[in-house]
C-alpha cells in the first residue's frame, strides 16, 4: 500500500507484456500428444495367408512382445497372401517413442536373419501418427504427371526454406515408365525366356565403377556412359547373339513403349488430375504464423512459376482451423468478460463493480504472459481453461470488496478497511484457491496416454489464473478500493437486485432453520434424484469434431478391381459435387489420405478401397449433409458399402465384439452367429468381421521326378511365373534427375491370362535352349485359402463390428448385443469373447478419472481438516460437494449432452466452487462461534446471511462467464459450459440453504 506506485508499475508492465505474449504465444488446435502407434510390415512373396501367419507373423509378434514398452493387449497382426501387418501400440507411460522405435528397428534388423529366406523385407513405419498440417494439390487436366511433379518439386524446395516446415511428402504421383511387352510365342520360338530378357536389361541399368587413372600430378576417374538413354535404345538392346553374328534385339521379341502404367491408385480433386503435397510443422512453432509463412511462399510461387492451367488448392488446412478456433475462443473470452462486467454492474454497486471488473483483463493478460514464459501454448484446451476460470478470477476480488464495504459500514476508515479486508480474508481465499487448483492435478498422474497428454496444460492454466487473481485481490484491489470507492456510497432509491435476493434469502433461511431435518432430507433427495438422472444420460468420453469437413470411405469386396472401385467412387463424387453445400471433393481411389486430423487414422488401402475428403461451407452444413446421405447411401451399391464418416476425436469403432480361439472354423461360426443377430437390428448397418471370405489361389505342385530331370526347382519356377504373369522391374533409365523404370510386362493384346492358361506358361530350364510348359512338370489347380488371419495379443481373434445409423446410441446397442452374446449365443469350445470399441475406450478412461477425483478429494479432505481441525465440519464439507450434481445432470439432460471427458472437467470445477463457498461460509461461522462466543445456530444463521451475497455474486459471475461457451456450438466444450452454468446455479441454491443448517446440527 505504501509503495503502490511500484506495484502499479509492475502490474502495468506485466499487463502490456501479456498483450504482446497473446500475439507471440504458440497456437495449436489441440495440445501436442503422442500417438503411440506404429506398423511393422513383413513382405513374404508367394506365401499363402496360412504360411505368412506361421512363418512370419508369429515370430514377429513374439519378438516385438519381448519389449516391455509394447502394449501387448492392443498389438494386432494381419496375415494375408504374401504380406503381414503388425500394428504395434506402445504403453501409455512411454513419452519418448522415438527412442523405443529406434530400439525396435535395430532389433528387427538383427532378427530378420531368423526369418525364412523368402521374406523379402521387414519395414517399420514409426511416424504412423504424424499429422499433416497442410494438404495442397496441384491440379491440371492438360499437364502430365511429370510436369505436375516438377512444379511440386519446385514448390517443395521453396517451402523447405521455412524453418517451421517439416516432412514434405508427395502423394498421387504417377510414374512414367518404359514398358517392354514380351511376346511369349516369339520367346519360346527362340528358345529363351523372360529371364534372359530381364537379365540383359538389368545389366545395362547398373552404374559400374570404372576405376581411375592417376599419375604424379592428378587422378582422373573413369566414367562409363550409360547405353540406355530412352525407349529407342532399350528396343535396340541386344539380348542374344551367336558366333555367326546373328543377334536378337529386344524389339524382336517385345514391344517397347514409353507410357504411364495403369495405376494401382490415384488422386483426383474435384474430378481433376492432381498430385498432392503433405506438409507437417515442427513442434513448438505457432501454426497460425506457419500458415502465414506458407501463404506468402505460395503466392510468390503461383505468380512467378505456375502456368494458368495449373491450380493450387488447399484440402486440409490446420492453420486455418486453428486460426478460426483461436479467434472463436478469444471472441468468447472477450464476450464473457463483457457479460461478467455487465452482471457485476447490475448486481454490485457501480464503483465496486468497476474495481472488481478491472481485475478481469489484468488477470487474464498477465496469465497469458506467464503462460508464454512457461512455454504453455494457446490451444483449445488452454483457451477453454481461460474461459472456465474467467468467472472465478473475479471471485477473490468480490470477497475482498465485500469485506471492505462491511468495514466501511461499521465506521472504519478507508485505509483500515482496505488493509483489514485483505488481511482477514487472505487465509480463507488462499486455502480455497489452493483447493480449487489442487483438484485438477491428480488427474494428470492417473490419466496416461493420449488423454493424459491432452489435459497436461489444463490445471496449470487454471492455477496461473487463480493465483494471479489472488495476488491482485490482496495487493492491487485494496488501493483501487481507496481510489474509487468513497467512504459512504450513495444509496440508490429503491432496492437493488442484490437487496431483493438477500431479502428473499433471509425468509428462506429462517424457514430452513425452522425445518432443519426436512431441509437436510431435501438435499439428500436431490443427490439421489441426480444419480438416477445421471444413469439415464449417454456416455461418450470424447465427442465428434465440429468441422466444415468430413470423410467418405468406400469398401468393395477384397478382389474387386480398381476399375469397379473407381466407378462406385465416381457415382458418389458426382452426387456430392452437385450439392451446393460442398466446396470441394478430393478422391483417393485405391489409396488412403495422409492423416489430416490427429484422431483420423489412415486405412491400409487396396484396389477395393476409396476415400473422399469433403470440405463444406459450414459446420451446420456438414451435419445436414451427413443426415441426408449417410443412411441413404450406405447400401446404395450392391457390391459396395459407402461410409459417410463424421470426423471424430475418438479413434475406435463404436461397436466391436471380439472372439478369441485357436480354430478358425470355430471363430467363424461364433462370429457368423452374432452377425446374423446383428443384421436384424434396424439401428445397425454394414455388419461385418475383419476375417474376409476365403479366396482362391492357384496351387502349383512340381512333379519331383520330371522337374528334377530338367533342373527346375521351386525357386526357378516361381521366378519364371513372376516374369510371365506380373510386371517385373528390370532396370532404370535416367533423363537428368528423372528416373524412368524399365518394366517387363505381358502384352494384353494377346489376350488376358486365364486361370486355365497358367499351365501353358513356359518355364526356362537350366538346360540350354530348353523351355517347357508348366503343365508338363507340375499339377496346377485352384484351391481355397484364407484371405486374412488376424491376431490380437498373439492369439487368433476375429472381430465383429458394425456402423450405427445416425442418431443411434452406441452405449445402448452395446448393452443389447452383449446380452445376446451372454444369453443366446452358443460359443464353440475354446472360444472366448471380449467387448471392444467405444465401450472399451470409455471404461479404460473412466477408472483413471475416478482415481484422479478420489485423490483430489483426499487432498481436499486434509486441507479442510488442517484448517478447521474438526472431523464433523470436514465431513460436511466433503458431503456438500455432491450438491453440485443435481443442477449439472439436469442441465446435461435438458441440453441432450453426453457425459464425457469435458463434462467431467466441468464437474471438477464445480467441486472447487463449492469448496470455496463452504470454506468462506464456515470460516465466518467458526470465527463468530469461537471469538464472539455465539451459539452454533446463531453463528450459522449469521454466516448464511453474511456470506450469501458474495457467494451469490461469485457464483453468478462464474456461471455467466461460461455462457458464450454454452452457446458457441462446440460439441467439445459446450458440455463444460452447461455443467458449470446449471451446476453452479443449482449448487448455489442448495449450498446457501442446506449448509448453514448442517453446521448448526454439527454442534447440537
Where are these regions (language model features)?
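Transmembrane alpha-helices and their membrane-interface boundaries in multi-pass membrane transporters
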Residues: 390-404, 425-446, 453-493, 612, ...
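Transmembrane helices with small-residue packing motifs
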Residues: 13-47, 95, 109-116, 443-454, ...
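Hydrophobic transmembrane alpha-helices and their membrane-interface caps
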Residues: 18-24, 338, 342-346, 350-405, ...
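Solvent-exposed, membrane-proximal periplasmic/extracellular interface segments of envelope transport
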Residues: 15, 51-127, 185-206, 227, ...
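Signature of alpha-helical transmembrane segments and their immediate interfacial
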Residues: 1-27, 423-425, 437, 479, ...
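Helix-loop junctions and hydrophobic alpha-helical segments within the transmembrane domains
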Residues: 315, 322, 326, 401, ...
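Extracytoplasmic/periplasmic membrane-proximal domains and adjacent transmembrane bundles
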Residues: 83-85, 112, 158-338, 401, ...
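Solvent-exposed, non-transmembrane alpha-helical starts
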Residues: 9, 48-55, 93-103, 132-135, ...
Amino acid at each position: 500500500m505504501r509503495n503502490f506506485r511500484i506495484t502499479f508499475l509492475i502490474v502495468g508492465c506485466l499487463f502490456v507484456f501479456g498483450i504482446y505474449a497473446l500475439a507471440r504465444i504458440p497456437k495449436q488446435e489441440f495440445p501436442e500428444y503422442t500417438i503411440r502407434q506404429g506398423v511393422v510390415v513383413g513382405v513374404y512373396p508367394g506365401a499363402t495367408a496360412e504360411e505368412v501367419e506361421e512363418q512370419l507373423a508369429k515370430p514377429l509378434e513374439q519378438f516385438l512382445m519381448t519389449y516391455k514398452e509394447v502394449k501387448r493387449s492392443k498389438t494386432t497382426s494381419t496375415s494375408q497372401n504374401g504380406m503381414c501387418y503388425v500394428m504395434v501400440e506402445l504403453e501409455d507411460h512411454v513419452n519418448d517413442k522415438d527412442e523405443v522405435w529406434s530400439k525396435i528397428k535395430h532389433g528387427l534388423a538383427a532378427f530378420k536373419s531368423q526369418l525364412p529366406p523368402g521374406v523379402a523385407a521387414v519395414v517399420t513405419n514409426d511416424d504412423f501418427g504424424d499429422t499433416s498440417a497442410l494438404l495442397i494439390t496441384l491440379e491440371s487436366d492438360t499437364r502430365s504427371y511429370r510436369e505436375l511433379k516438377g512444379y511440386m518439386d519446385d514448390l517443395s524446395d521453396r517451402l523447405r526454406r521455412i524453418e517451421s516446415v517439416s516432412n514434405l511428402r508427395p502423394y498421387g504421383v504417377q510414374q512414367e515408365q518404359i514398358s517392354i511387352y514380351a511376346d511369349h510365342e516369339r520367346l519360346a520360338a527362340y528358345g529363351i525366356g523372360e529371364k534372359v530378357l530381364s537379365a540383359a536389361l538389368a545389366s545395362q541399368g547398373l552404374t559400374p565403377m570404372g576405376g581411375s587413372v592417376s599419375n604424379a600430378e592428378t587422378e582422373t576417374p573413369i566414367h562409363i556412359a550409360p547405353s540406355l538413354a530412352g525407349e529407342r535404345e532399350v528396343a535396340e538392346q541386344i539380348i542374344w547373339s551367336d558366333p555367326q553374328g546373328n543377334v536378337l534385339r529386344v524389339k524382336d521379341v517385345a514391344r517397347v513403349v514409353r507410357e504411364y502404367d495403369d495405376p494401382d491408385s490415384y488422386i483426383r480433386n474435384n474430378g481433376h488430375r492432381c498430385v498432392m503435397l503433405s506438409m507437417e510443422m515442427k513442434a513448438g512453432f505457432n501454426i497460425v504464423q506457419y500458415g502465414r509463412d506458407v501463404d506468402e511462399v505460395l503466392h510468390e510461387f503461383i505468380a512467378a512459376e505456375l502456368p494458368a492451367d495449373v491450380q493450387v488448392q488447399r484440402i486440409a488446412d490446420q492453420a486455418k482451423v486453428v486460426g478460426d478456433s483461436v479467434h472463436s475462443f478469444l471472441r468468447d473470452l472477450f464476450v464473457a468478460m463483457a457479460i461478467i462486467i455487465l452482471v457485476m454492474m447490475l448486481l454490485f454497486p457501480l464503483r465496486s463493480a468497476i474495481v472488481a471488473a478491472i481485475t478481469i483483463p489484468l488477470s487474464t493478460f498477465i496469465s497469458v504472459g506467464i503462460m508464454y514464459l512457461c512455454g504453455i501454448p494457446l490451444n483449445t484446451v488452454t483457451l477453454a481453461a481461460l474461459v472456465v476460470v474467467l468467472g472465478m478470477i473475479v471471485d477473490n476480488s468480490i470477497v475482498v470488496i465485500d469485506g471492505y464495504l462491511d468495514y466501511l459500514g461499521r465506521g472504519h476508515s478507508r485505509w483500515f478497511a482496505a488493509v483489514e479486508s485483505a488481511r482477514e480474508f487472505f487465509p480463507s481465499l488462499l486455502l480455497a484457491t489452493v483447493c480449487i487448483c489442487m483438484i485438477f492435478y491428480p488427474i494428470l498422474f492417473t490419466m496416461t496416454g493420449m488423454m493424459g497428454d491432452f489435459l497436461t496444460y489444463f490445471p496449470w492454466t487454471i492455477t496461473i489464473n487463480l493465483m494471479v487473481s489472488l495476488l491482485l485481490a490482496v495487493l492491487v484491489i485494496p488501493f483501487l478500493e481507496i481510489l474509487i470507492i468513497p467512504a459512504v456510497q450513495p444509496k440508490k432509491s429503491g432496492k437493488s437486485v442484490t437487496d431483493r435476493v438477500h431479502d428473499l434469502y433471509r425468509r428462506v433461511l429462517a424457514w430452513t432453520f425452522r425445518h432443519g431435518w426436512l431441509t437436510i432430507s431435501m438435499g439428500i433427495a436431490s443427490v439421489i434424484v441426480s444419480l438416477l438422472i445421471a444413469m439415464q444420460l449417454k456416455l461418450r468420453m470424447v465427442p465428434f469434431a465440429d468441422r466444415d469437413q468430413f470423410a467418405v470411405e468406400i469398401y468393395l469386396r477384397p478382389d474387386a478391381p480398381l476399375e469397379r472401385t473407381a466407378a462406385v467412387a465416381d457415382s458418389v463424387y458426382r452426387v456430392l459435387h452437385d450439392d451446393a453445400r460442398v466446396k470441394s471433393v478430393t478422391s483417393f481411389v485405391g489409396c488412403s489420405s495422409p492423416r489430416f486430423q490427429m484422431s483420423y487414422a489412415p486405412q491400409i488401402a487396396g484396389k477395393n478401397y476409396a476415400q473422399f475428403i469433403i470440405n463444406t461451407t459450414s459446420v451446420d452444413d456438414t451435419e445436414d449433409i451427413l443426415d441426408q446421405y449417410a443412411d441413404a447411401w450406405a447400401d446404395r451399391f450392391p457390391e459396395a458399402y459407402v461410409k459417410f464418416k463424421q470426423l471424430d476425436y475418438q479413434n475406435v469403432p463404436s461397436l466391436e465384439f471380439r472372439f478369441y480361439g485357436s480354430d478358425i472354423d470355430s471363430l467363424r461360426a461364433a462370429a457368423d452367429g452374432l452377425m446374423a443377430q446383428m443384421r436384424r437390428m434396424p439401428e445397425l448397418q454394414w455388419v461385418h468381421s475383419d476375417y474376409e471370405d476365403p479366396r482362391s489361389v492357384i496351387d502349383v505342385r512340381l512333379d519331383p521326378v520330371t522337374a528334377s530331370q530338367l533342373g527346375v526347382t521351386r525357386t526357378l519356377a516361381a521366378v519364371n511365373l513372376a516374369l510371365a504373369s506380373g510386371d517385373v522391374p528390370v532396370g532404370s533409365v535416367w533423363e537428368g534427375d528423372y528416373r524412368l523404370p524399365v518394366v517387363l510386362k505381358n502384352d494384353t493384346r494377346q489376350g488376358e491370362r486365364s486361370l486355365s492358361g497358367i499351365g501353358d506358361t513356359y518355364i526356362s530350364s537350366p538346360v540350354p535352349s530348353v523351355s517347357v510348359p508348366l503343365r508338363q512338370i507340375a499339377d496346377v489347380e485352384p484351391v481355397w485359402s484364407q484371405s486374412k488371419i488376424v491376431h490380437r495379443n498373439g492369439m487368433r481373434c476375429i472381430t465383429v463390428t458394425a456402423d450405427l445409423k445416425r442418431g443411434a446410441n452406441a452405449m445402448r446397442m452395446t448393452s443389447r448385443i452383449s446380452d445376446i452374446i451372454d444369453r443366446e449365443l452358443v460359443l464353440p469350445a475354446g472360444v472366448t469373447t471380449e467387448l471392444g470399441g467405444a465401450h472399451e475406450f470409455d471404461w479404460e478412461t473412466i477408472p483413471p478419472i475416478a482415481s484422479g477425483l478420489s485423490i483430489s478429494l483426499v487432498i481436499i479432505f486434509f486441507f479442510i481438516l488442517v484448517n478447521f481441525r474438526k472431523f464433523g465440519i470436514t465431513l460436511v464439507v466433503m458431503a456438500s460437494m455432491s450438491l453440485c450434481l443435481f443442477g449439472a445432470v439436469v442441465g446435461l439432460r435438458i441440453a441432450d449432452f453426453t457425459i464425457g471427458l469435458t463434462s467431467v472437467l466441468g464437474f471438477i470445477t464445480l467441486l472447487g466452487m463449492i469448496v470455496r463457498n463452504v470454506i468462506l461460509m464456515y470460516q465466518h461461522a467458526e470465527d463468530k462461534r469461537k471469538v464472539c462466543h455465539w451459539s452454533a445456530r446463531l453463528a450459522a444463521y449469521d454466516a448464511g446471511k453474511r456470506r450469501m451475497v458474495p457467494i451469490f455474486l461469485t457464483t453468478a459471475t462464474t456461471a455467466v462467464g461460461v455462457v458464450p461457451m454454452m452457446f458457441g456450438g462446440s460439441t467439445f466444450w459446450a458440455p463444460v459450459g452447461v455443467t458449470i452454468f446449471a451446476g453452479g446455479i443449482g449448487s448455489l441454491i442448495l449450498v446457501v440453504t442446506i449448509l448453514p443448517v448442517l453446521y448448526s446440527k454439527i454442534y447440537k
